[in-house]
A protein has these predicted regions:
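Short gly/ser-rich loop at a beta-strand->alpha-helix junction or flexible surface loop bordering the NTP-binding
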Residues: 1-191
Length: 191
């Protein structure tokens, strides 16, 4: 026996189907069932989307935020492609242009928008609830108001669409309650 470290082939998945266990053990990521326990790390979440990632694609927005922090998987794969290539694949949403190096990070050889850039892009272009939630997630993961505003300042030209909205969301969310801890506080033995 050997552990499952990647997506199982369809024939193995078909043989292992059990309606009661599927919802506990598997989650659909871009239409492919993935074992939940493999999605507990950024590397595992990246592995779940890498097969669908176009060559030289940079993960953006909700996809990048999901890779970094987890949560419900994205319904589409959002990527930035050099040269403005487009895709007709229903699960792939492409954007033209390049991100500044300061707005990207590399995870297992794949370039991905930082938490700050992903949150800013969602705040600029996403639905209102998702926009506020993205900034709250960034705040809860230690991203400061200054970092978010500096990242927003990198959005120039066509990428400046939605910047006033994003700035307003950042100001409102970051001026509110103090950041919540990502991990629950440790029990204090003294009291």
């Amino acid at each position: 026996l050997s552990p499952v470290l990647d997506t199982l082939p369809p024939q193995d998945m078909q043989a292992l189907r059990c309606a009661e266990l599927d919802s506990r053990l598997l989650v659909s990521v871009l239409g492919n069932l993935q074992p939940v326990d493999l999605l507990r790390s950024a590397e595992g979440r990246l592995r779940a989307v890498i097969a669908a990632l176009p060559h030289q694609g940079v993960l953006l927005a909700s996809t990048a935020l999901w890779v970094h922090v987890g949560g419900p998987p994205p319904e589409t794969l959002e990527v930035c492609l050099p040269g403005g290539r487009r895709s007709r694949l229903p699960y792939l949403e492409t954007r033209r242009g390049r991100l500044p190096r300061s707005d990207t990070t590399v995870i297992n050889g794949v370039t991905c928008a930082t938490i700050a850039r992903a949150a800013v892009d969602i705040a600029r272009l996403g639905p209102p609830v998702a926009a506020v939630r993205a900034i709250m997630i960034a705040r809860d993961h230690g991203i400061s108001r200054v970092r978010l505003l500096l990242t927003l300042n990198h959005c120039r030209g066509a990428a400046s669409r939605g910047c006033p909205r994003a700035q307003h969301i950042i100001e409102e969310v970051m001026s509110g309650a103090p950041p919540r801890a990502v991990a629950p506080p440790e029990n204090d033995a003294d009291g």
